[in-house]
Protein backbone atom coordinates (compact mmCIF):
# COMPACT_ATOMS: atom_id res chain seq x y z
CA UNK A 1 0.00 0.00 0.00
CA UNK A 2 2.77 2.43 0.90
CA UNK A 3 4.57 1.94 -2.40
CA UNK A 4 1.37 2.64 -4.32
CA UNK A 5 0.33 5.77 -2.46
CA UNK A 6 3.76 7.44 -2.51
CA UNK A 7 4.01 8.25 -6.25
CA UNK A 8 0.80 10.30 -6.58
CA UNK A 9 1.51 11.98 -3.24
CA UNK A 10 5.03 12.84 -4.45
CA UNK A 11 3.71 14.21 -7.74
CA UNK A 12 1.07 16.28 -5.95
CA UNK A 13 3.53 17.71 -3.43
CA UNK A 14 6.05 18.45 -6.20
CA UNK A 15 3.31 20.39 -7.98
CA UNK A 16 2.31 22.29 -4.84
CA UNK A 17 5.82 23.06 -3.59
CA UNK A 18 7.94 23.50 -6.71
CA UNK A 19 5.34 23.91 -9.46
CA UNK A 20 6.24 20.72 -11.29
CA UNK A 21 3.53 19.73 -13.78
CA UNK A 22 2.92 16.32 -15.32
CA UNK A 23 0.22 16.93 -17.90
CA UNK A 24 -2.73 14.64 -18.48
CA UNK A 25 -0.69 11.65 -19.68
CA UNK A 26 1.75 12.00 -16.81
CA UNK A 27 -1.02 12.00 -14.21
CA UNK A 28 -2.78 9.13 -15.97
CA UNK A 29 0.44 7.10 -15.92
CA UNK A 30 1.16 7.88 -12.25
CA UNK A 31 -2.38 6.92 -11.24
CA UNK A 32 -2.35 3.70 -13.31
CA UNK A 33 0.99 2.67 -11.79
CA UNK A 34 -0.16 3.58 -8.28
CA UNK A 35 -3.45 1.68 -8.55
CA UNK A 36 -1.59 -1.30 -10.00
CA UNK A 37 0.90 -1.31 -7.13
CA UNK A 38 -1.88 -1.10 -4.53
CA UNK A 39 -3.71 -3.89 -6.39
CA UNK A 40 -0.68 -6.14 -5.84
CA UNK A 41 -1.57 -6.10 -2.15
CA UNK A 42 -5.28 -6.78 -2.74
CA UNK A 43 -5.11 -10.35 -1.43
CA UNK A 44 -3.47 -9.26 1.82
CA UNK A 45 -5.97 -6.43 2.22
CA UNK A 46 -8.86 -8.84 1.58
CA UNK A 47 -7.59 -11.12 4.35
CA UNK A 48 -7.90 -8.28 6.84
CA UNK A 49 -4.32 -7.13 6.63
CA UNK A 50 -5.32 -3.48 6.87
CA UNK A 51 -6.24 -2.26 10.32
CA UNK A 52 -6.29 1.27 11.63
CA UNK A 53 -2.79 0.79 13.00
CA UNK A 54 -1.37 -0.68 9.80
CA UNK A 55 -3.05 2.04 7.71
CA UNK A 56 -1.54 4.72 9.96
CA UNK A 57 1.87 3.09 9.65
CA UNK A 58 1.55 2.79 5.89
CA UNK A 59 0.53 6.43 5.50
CA UNK A 60 3.33 7.57 7.80
CA UNK A 61 5.79 5.61 5.69
CA UNK A 62 4.24 7.16 2.57
CA UNK A 63 4.92 10.60 4.02
CA UNK A 64 8.54 9.68 4.73
CA UNK A 65 9.03 8.35 1.19
CA UNK A 66 7.48 11.50 -0.31
CA UNK A 67 9.69 13.79 1.77
CA UNK A 68 12.97 12.00 1.11
CA UNK A 69 12.15 11.61 -2.59
CA UNK A 70 11.52 15.34 -2.98
CA UNK A 71 14.56 16.32 -0.91
CA UNK A 72 16.83 13.91 -2.76
CA UNK A 73 15.44 14.85 -6.18
CA UNK A 74 15.99 18.53 -5.48
CA UNK A 75 19.42 17.78 -3.99
CA UNK A 76 20.43 15.97 -7.17
CA UNK A 77 19.23 18.92 -9.23
CA UNK A 78 21.19 21.39 -7.11
CA UNK A 79 24.40 19.35 -7.33
CA UNK A 80 23.74 18.58 -10.99
CA UNK A 81 24.51 14.91 -10.49
CA UNK A 82 22.62 12.04 -8.91
CA UNK A 83 25.91 10.17 -8.44
CA UNK A 84 27.60 13.02 -6.56
CA UNK A 85 24.56 13.58 -4.36
CA UNK A 86 24.18 9.88 -3.49
CA UNK A 87 27.91 9.49 -2.85
CA UNK A 88 27.85 12.38 -0.38
CA UNK A 89 24.70 11.05 1.29
CA UNK A 90 26.16 7.56 1.68
CA UNK A 91 29.48 8.93 2.94
CA UNK A 92 27.71 11.11 5.51
CA UNK A 93 25.57 8.18 6.59
CA UNK A 94 28.62 5.94 6.99
CA UNK A 95 30.48 8.59 8.97
CA UNK A 96 27.52 8.92 11.34
CA UNK A 97 26.54 5.25 11.60
CA UNK A 98 29.96 3.60 11.85
CA UNK A 99 30.75 5.00 15.32
CA UNK A 100 27.22 4.18 16.49
CA UNK A 101 27.54 0.59 15.31
CA UNK A 102 30.87 0.30 17.11
CA UNK A 103 29.39 1.77 20.27
CA UNK A 104 26.30 -0.44 20.33
CA UNK A 105 27.59 -3.67 18.77
CA UNK A 106 31.32 -3.45 19.45
CA UNK A 107 33.36 -6.53 18.58
CA UNK A 108 30.33 -8.27 17.11
CA UNK A 109 29.97 -5.51 14.51
CA UNK A 110 33.67 -5.71 13.61
CA UNK A 111 33.44 -9.50 13.27
CA UNK A 112 30.31 -9.28 11.07
CA UNK A 113 31.96 -6.64 8.92
CA UNK A 114 35.12 -8.74 8.59
CA UNK A 115 33.11 -11.78 7.47
CA UNK A 116 30.78 -9.99 5.07
CA UNK A 117 32.80 -7.02 3.83
CA UNK A 118 32.66 -8.10 0.20
CA UNK A 119 28.91 -8.70 0.35
CA UNK A 120 28.45 -5.32 2.09
CA UNK A 121 30.63 -3.58 -0.47
CA UNK A 122 28.75 -5.18 -3.38
CA UNK A 123 25.37 -4.39 -1.88
CA UNK A 124 26.44 -0.83 -1.18
CA UNK A 125 27.69 -0.38 -4.74
CA UNK A 126 24.41 -1.70 -6.17
CA UNK A 127 22.39 0.55 -3.85
CA UNK A 128 24.52 3.53 -4.89
CA UNK A 129 24.07 2.74 -8.59
CA UNK A 130 20.33 2.13 -8.31
CA UNK A 131 19.56 5.28 -6.39
CA UNK A 132 22.00 7.39 -8.42
CA UNK A 133 20.19 6.35 -11.61
CA UNK A 134 16.84 7.36 -10.10
CA UNK A 135 18.22 10.71 -8.95
CA UNK A 136 19.90 11.31 -12.30
CA UNK A 137 16.50 10.74 -13.91
CA UNK A 138 15.02 13.31 -11.51
CA UNK A 139 17.45 15.90 -12.90
CA UNK A 140 15.92 15.31 -16.35
CA UNK A 141 12.26 14.54 -15.69
CA UNK A 142 9.56 15.47 -13.17
CA UNK A 143 10.23 13.94 -9.76
CA UNK A 144 6.69 12.51 -9.58
CA UNK A 145 7.13 10.53 -12.80
CA UNK A 146 10.48 9.11 -11.73
CA UNK A 147 9.03 8.24 -8.32
CA UNK A 148 6.23 6.28 -10.00
CA UNK A 149 8.60 4.41 -12.30
CA UNK A 150 10.93 3.63 -9.39
CA UNK A 151 8.13 1.96 -7.45
CA UNK A 152 7.39 -0.42 -10.32
CA UNK A 153 10.18 -2.59 -8.90
CA UNK A 154 7.54 -4.20 -6.67
CA UNK A 155 6.12 -5.81 -9.81
CA UNK A 156 9.44 -7.54 -10.45
CA UNK A 157 9.48 -8.70 -6.83
CA UNK A 158 5.99 -10.18 -7.27
CA UNK A 159 7.00 -11.94 -10.48
CA UNK A 160 10.18 -13.31 -8.91
CA UNK A 161 8.16 -14.45 -5.90
CA UNK A 162 5.84 -16.39 -8.18
CA UNK A 163 8.59 -17.88 -10.35
CA UNK A 164 11.19 -18.67 -7.68
CA UNK A 165 9.06 -19.34 -4.61
CA UNK A 166 5.73 -20.48 -6.02
CA UNK A 167 3.78 -17.53 -4.63
CA UNK A 168 0.31 -17.28 -6.19
CA UNK A 169 -0.07 -14.98 -9.19
CA UNK A 170 -3.82 -14.99 -9.68
CA UNK A 171 -6.23 -12.72 -11.56
CA UNK A 172 -5.81 -9.77 -9.17
CA UNK A 173 -2.08 -9.76 -9.72
CA UNK A 174 -2.55 -9.97 -13.50
CA UNK A 175 -4.80 -6.89 -13.33
CA UNK A 176 -2.11 -5.16 -11.27
CA UNK A 177 0.50 -6.12 -13.86
CA UNK A 178 -1.62 -4.72 -16.69
CA UNK A 179 -2.18 -1.45 -14.82
CA UNK A 180 1.51 -1.00 -14.01
CA UNK A 181 2.73 -1.88 -17.49
CA UNK A 182 -0.06 0.26 -18.95
CA UNK A 183 1.13 3.22 -16.89
CA UNK A 184 4.69 2.71 -18.10
CA UNK A 185 3.50 2.48 -21.72
CA UNK A 186 1.45 5.66 -21.35
CA UNK A 187 4.60 7.48 -20.26
CA UNK A 188 6.68 6.05 -23.07
CA UNK A 189 4.20 6.32 -25.91
CA UNK A 190 3.02 9.78 -24.94
CA UNK A 191 6.58 11.05 -24.73
CA UNK A 192 6.14 12.10 -21.10
Q: How would you name each of these model-derived features?
A:
Residues 1-2, 21, 77-84, 133-152:
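Structural motif at transmembrane-helix junctions in multi-pass transporters
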Residues 2-16, 92-96, 130-133, 149-163, ...:
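Alpha-helical transmembrane segments of compact multi-pass small-molecule transporters, enriched
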Residues 3, 8-13, 19, 63-71, ...:
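Specific transmembrane alpha-helical segments of multi-pass solute transporters/efflux pumps
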Residues 5, 27-31, 56, 60, ...:
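Hydrophobic residues within alpha-helical transmembrane segments
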Residues 11-15, 24-44, 173-191:
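Hydrophobic transmembrane alpha-helices of multi-pass small-molecule transport proteins
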Residues 12-16, 20-21, 74, 78, ...:
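Membrane-interface helix caps of multi-pass small-molecule transporters
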Residues 35, 42-57, 91-123, 128, ...:
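Membrane-interface interhelical linkers
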Residues 48-84, 192:
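Glycine-/small-residue-enriched transmembrane alpha-helix faces in small-molecule transporters
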